[in-house]
A protein has these predicted regions:
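Class I S-adenosyl-L-methionine-dependent methyltransferase catalytic core
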Residues: 1-185
């Protein structure tokens, strides 16, 4: 399956994906829906343009690189798997996005202290493990979230929702997108 960036400066660029079943890249239609909502919803405060974005459970980096392609100021990437990190580094280099990218090799549930705060947090964890609430708590505790950070997560359709007021929720086949503000502000 070819994984392509959908829009922006790098539209159509093919990204490498990790071999095997290590990751589950977001489907193009789900990524399109995510970024459409970030660009047009009134609560999204103008979307990714000129804002720092953090891609958590980054995998191939498709979400963070899509954000950069669409004008994000910078993208942080958190990924723990060494083989996946190598693919992510190659994708960042292929997009010539090294200067705009910060790659952190870490478990999203136990990240190091943040080098910066991020305004938009994109989470795409494995389905069925209820990792979003744990990751958001860990990211807050270590300083990754701006006080008014917008959190967007892709969950499995049957995954439990976080205990926070959602700004929006949309289903796309087996995936569900949720959006909410930093609950720790």
């Amino acid at each position: 399956m070819a994984l392509r960036l959908i829009a922006g400066a790098w539209r159509g660029r093919v990204l490498e994906t990790p071999a095997g079943a290590i990751t589950r890249p977001s489907a193009a239609r789900v990524r399109q829906a995510l970024f459409d909502m970030l660009a047009h919803a009134p609560w999204a405060m103008g979307g990714v343009v000129d804002r720092p974005v953090l891609d958590v459970f980054a995998g191939s980096g498709a979400l963070g690189l899509e954000a950069l392609s669409r004008g994000a100021a910078q993208a942080g990437f958190i990924e723990q798997d060494r083989a996946v990190l190598a693919v992510l580094q190659r994708n960042i280099a292929a997009c010539r996005a090294t200067a705009q990218s910060r790659l952190t090799a870490a478990n999203a549930l136990a990240p190091p202290q943040a080098p910066a705060r991020f305004a938009i947090i994109l989470l795409d964890p494995p389905y069925g493990q209820n990792l979003v609430p744990q990751a958001v708590t860990a990211l807050h505790r270590t300083g990754w979230l701006a006080p008014d950070a917008l959190i967007a997560a892709e969950l499995g359709r049957d995954d439990p929702l976080p205990d926070h007021e959602l700004l929006a929720e949309r289903s796309h086949g087996p995936a569900r997108l949720i959006f909410y503000l930093n609950p720790n502000r």
